[in-house]
Swiss-Prot record:
Species in which this protein is naturally found: Human papillomavirus type 6c
Keywords (A to Z) from UniProt: Early protein
Protein name, UniProt field: Probable protein E4
Family membership: Belongs to the papillomaviridae E4 protein family.
Pfam families per UniProt: Pap_E4
Length: 108
């Protein structure tokens, strides 16, 4: 493609004017430089590190055997407990030293 000579001079004159305007504006407004520079990529987001796993010890099957309690259980009341059960409930009744009857009923 052949460019006419007159068009070449017109284009050079326009480019000359634009560059001088740009340089004059660039000195006055330095943020114009951002129009011609590619944006910087943001740094990758840092994920917080996972918490450290605590050391767990597997139990052997021999450790699952019920061991006798080191201290025997002593009930504070002298009266025995009365336990009644049905297919859908459990009732426990006892009396305190003062004579108050306490009944607990658990419905399943």
């Amino acid at each position: 493609m052949v460019v006419p000579i007159i068009g070449k001079y017109v284009m050079a004159a326009q480019l000359y004017v634009l560059l001088h305007l740009y340089l004059a504006l660039y000195e006055k407004y330095p943020l114009l430089n951002l129009l011609h520079t590619p944006p910087h990529r943001p740094p990758p987001l840092q994920c917080p590190p996972a918490p450290r796993k605590t050391a767990c010890r597997r139990r052997l099957e021999s450790e699952h055997v019920d061991r006798p309690l080191t201290t025997p259980c002593v009930w504070p009341t002298l009266d025995p407990w009365t336990v009644q059960s049905t297919t859908s409930s459990l009732t426990i009744t006892t009396s305190t030293k003062e004579g108050t009857t306490v009944t607990v009923q658990l419905r399943l």
